[in-house]
Design a protein with these regions (language model features):
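Membrane-interface alpha helices of multi-pass inner-membrane proteins
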Residues: 300-317
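Active-site lumenal/periplasmic loops and adjacent helix-entry segments of GT-C-fold
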Residues: 127, 135-277, 577-592
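Membrane-interface helix-loop junctions at the exits of transmembrane helices
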Residues: 46-48, 139-146, 171-174, 246-265, ...
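Membrane-embedded, hydrophobic transmembrane alpha-helices
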Residues: 1-124
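Membrane-interface transmembrane helices that cradle and orient dolichyl/undecaprenyl
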Residues: 279-300
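Membrane-helix boundary/interfacial segments in multi-pass membrane proteins
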Residues: 7, 56-64, 148-154, 208, ...
């Protein structure tokens, strides 16, 4: 199974990176930028092709969807390369007056790459560090906690995610405009941000339609490769001349329990996870566009940013508002700071422009809040669960819910990062974004009312999502804080070890002037650091300082300590996340391994695609998504997520009377339902049931069926599990 899982990860990487890389090189972006940006372009392309295929080629095999995207992006890349080649040759033709200098001009031709990266080999080494650290953290927190690579999370939303991906595979349709948990039963469906599900379906199609395996592989790929590379690109763009900060960012891309791991243990909110992860891929081209000197380059970069934003929104619309917060704050900061400037230029004109940008953003926010198509989202309310004081304490400790552990080390790093940005105000917008997100979390988790709806309604007023927002915005601040502490500790060590310990790396052309290196946690603009101090990792003291700080990071994240608070234990770091994943992915929970094996037997006994009436709370709500069993109820609720609530009520309350109830008989005829499956005996000693939205009185029509009930023939049994054929 391990080799199969690795194969699924490789397939996911190929789908995410090959088509998107080709399109990014068409702009052309540099090789590293193209690799980092590729997932956004691939996700957008897959989703749009899925919509087109629904109208033009229905059904469409999942591998064909990925193949078509690769072919299309390859064609675009080749055409763009040919056009650029022709244009370059035309521009290089010497006239009679300057033919003697033609070779010199050719050798001096500037690069046309966008987001070009000097010392490209170094950024690839940094990227390798990001991936390596993320691999270690993900292996400890996620992969090591799985009860098999094909296990799945026993979460409520997971029933939908697995069913939607399975429905895409069963029907050969991949349109986000026609999404439902019941596509295989003929439902047309409606709009749902299903970019995640399209990707999972494509990967699963290459591995026997194993949706659970593909889901876990995709989670691993996004956390080990995709998001770390996105953060690497972002930190390079913001702090490129300070390699200490860039390298420090490797520790923090997947270090916060609130994001990304909070979305893995709660919900699961996997579409929202990848939406947030792609925000840097839209932000970096936007930042570059504001600084680009040529109008043509600005246009290309804004197009790339728009494509990235579309990918973010199509994965989960609230990601677009997440991007908007960062983009607006950076744009306001950019008004006062020219490219490369360390000090702000403040005058009446710039202040007016900044106010105008903020005012326009507020107007757009209000317009979207009042838009009719947003009302179902912004009017959703999650009731407050904490007092304001509790929220103010838990938020900065990055324990946004009971599923997450406190992370005091990260709190200190972020605080130091905030102090740093207050001194180096070019990056102050990062702290403003984080503090705004933290305020959103505090408001969403501890208050109710109009302010909560207006400010956090785009995230469903869900404190899980606003907490993740704060964690996402904290990542670059943590990197800055860590680098600042390393530089400060390095200075202390040098004083104790003597000057002989200092072996600074020689300044290179693109590193020789670094005014932003953090010589101390509170270094000021009045005393900029040197290239030698910025590259702390190239001294003996710097290496020791980095090692000490990294060891502290590891201890505070993974040490299995806990403190008592009321009637519960609060764990440190990511330990609680690991325990949550271990519990939720266990085959001893709800849908057990024995029950899953029984489902396999059921699928062998009954005709293919035969509908089975079930009680979703006994674990069978996952049986369609996990195994492909055509169940009637696919979520733990009275309707099982079906549109016809009256039909669902009749079945769950009156099915046991099928021998005499004509209405039940007619409903079964309409549904073509001939089987009933029970995975638990409600009167048994140890039923593995969900308590969510389950009341025994609502399911008496199914759970009271026995082999003595008229109209039912027992055809398969094992322990307390039963399969009946309906006969009347």
């Amino acid at each position: 199974m391990a080799l199969t899982f690795i194969g699924a990860m490789i397939a996911c990487l190929a789908v995410l990176y090959i088509p998107g890389y080709l399109l990014a090189r068409s702009f052309p972006f540099s090789r590293f930028a193209s690799a980092a940006l590729a997932p956004a372009f691939s996700v957008l392309g897959l989703t749009l092709l899925g919509v087109a295929a629904y109208e033009l080629v229905n059904p469409c095999p999942a591998p064909a969807l990925a193949g078509a995207l690769i072919a299309l992006d390859l064609a675009v890349y080749l055409i763009c390369r040919i056009v650029r080649g022709v244009a370059a040759k035309a521009g290089d033709r010497p006239s009679s007056a300057d033919s003697g200098a033609s070779n010199v001009r050719a050798n001096r031709a500037p690069s046309t790459e966008l987001i070009s990266i000097p010392a490209d080999a170094r950024i690839w080494k940094a990227a390798a560090l990001y991936i390596g650290v993320a691999l270690i953290i993900t292996s400890i927190v996620f992969l090591g906690a799985l009860d098999g690579f094909d296990s799945f999370s026993r979460n409520d939303d997971t029933t939908v995610h697995l069913s939607v991906a399975r429905g895409f595979l069963d029907t050969g349709t991949f349109s986000t405009l026609h999404t439902s948990s019941f596509l295989d039963q003929g439902e047309i469906g409606g709009f749902y941000p299903a970019a995640w599900h399209v990707l999972v379906a494509v990967v699963a199609s290459l591995f026997g339609n194993d949706v659970s395996l593909a889901t876990n592989a995709a989670i691993a790929v996004f956390n080990i490769v995709m998001f770390p590379l996105a953060i690497c690109l972002l930190t390079w763009r913001l702090f490129g001349k300070n390699r200490t900060i860039v390298l420090s960012g490797a520790l923090f891309s997947v270090a916060f329990s609130g994001f990304p791991w909070g979305f893995v243990v709660f919900g699961q909110l996997l579409p929202n996870m990848i939406s947030f992860m792609m925000v840097p891929l839209a932000l970096v081209p936007f930042v570059e566009a504001l600084d680009a000197p040529r109008a043509r380059d600005k246009a290309k970069l804004l197009i790339a940013a728009a494509l990235g934003l579309c990918a973010v929104a199509i994965a989960q619309p609230n990601g677009a508002f997440t991007f908007g917060i960062l983009a607006v704050l950076y744009a306001i900061s950019r008004v006062f700071f020219e490219p490369g400037a360390q000090r702000a230029t403040v005058d009446a004109k710039r202040v007016a422009i900044a106010i105008a940008i903020f005012a326009v953003a507020c107007v757009l926010w209000g317009a979207m809040y009042l838009a009719p198509f947003m009302q179902a989202v912004v009017n959703t309310t999650w009731s407050a669960t904490l007092s304001p004081l509790e929220a103010i304490i838990s938020g900065p400790l990055f324990m946004f819910t009971v599923r997450q552990g406190v992370q005091p080390f990260l709190s200190v790093m972020v605080l130091v990062g905030i102090v740093y940005t207050c001194r180096h105000r070019r990056h102050l917008w990062l702290s403003v974004a984080y503090l705004a997100a933290l305020a959103f979390y505090i408001i969403s988790v501890s208050t109710d009312g109009a302010a909560k709806q207006i400010l956090t309604g785009f995230w469903y007023t869900d404190y899980n999502r606003t907490g993740a927002l704060a964690a996402l915005f904290a990542i670059p601040l943590a990197a800055v804080g860590f680098a600042s502490c390393v530089a400060w500790l390095k200075g202390l060590l040098e004083k104790r070890m003597g000057k002989s310990s200092v072996r600074p790396a020689p300044a290179t052309k693109d590193e020789g002037s670094i005014a932003e290196a953090p010589c101390s946690p509170v270094a000021s603009d009045a005393a900029p650091c040197t290239a030698a101090s910025a590259n702390a990792s190239f001294t003996r003291a710097g290496v020791i300082a980095a090692a000490i700080m990294t060891a502290l990071f590891a201890l505070c994240q993974f040490l299995p300590l806990s403190v008592g608070y009321g009637d519960r234990q609060i764990h440190l770091g990511l330990v609680n996340i690991n325990q949550e994943i271990s519990t939720r992915y266990s085959w001893d929970q709800t849908l057990t391994s024995e029950e899953d094996a029984f489902i396999d037997e059921v699928m062998e006994v009954i005709p293919e695609d035969a509908m089975v009436i079930n009680v979703p709370a006994d674990g069978s709500c996952w049986s369609y998504g996990v195994e492909g069993l055509n169940t009637f109820y696919r979520r733990s609720s009275n309707t099982g997520s079906r549109d016809d609530a009256q039909e669902a009520e009749l079945i769950r309350t009156q099915l046991c009377n099928v021998a005499t109830n004509k209405e039940v008989q007619q409903t079964l005829e309409d549904l073509d339902a001939r089987y009933v499956m029970l995975l638990d005996d409600p009167s048994g000693d140890n039923p593995t049931k969900l308590s969510l939205r389950y009341e025994e009185k609502n399911w008496t029509g199914i759970e009271t069926i026995t082999e003595d009930t008229p109209g039912f023939n027992l055809i398969l049994s094992e322990g307390d599990m039963r399969l009946y054929e309906i006969e009347y």
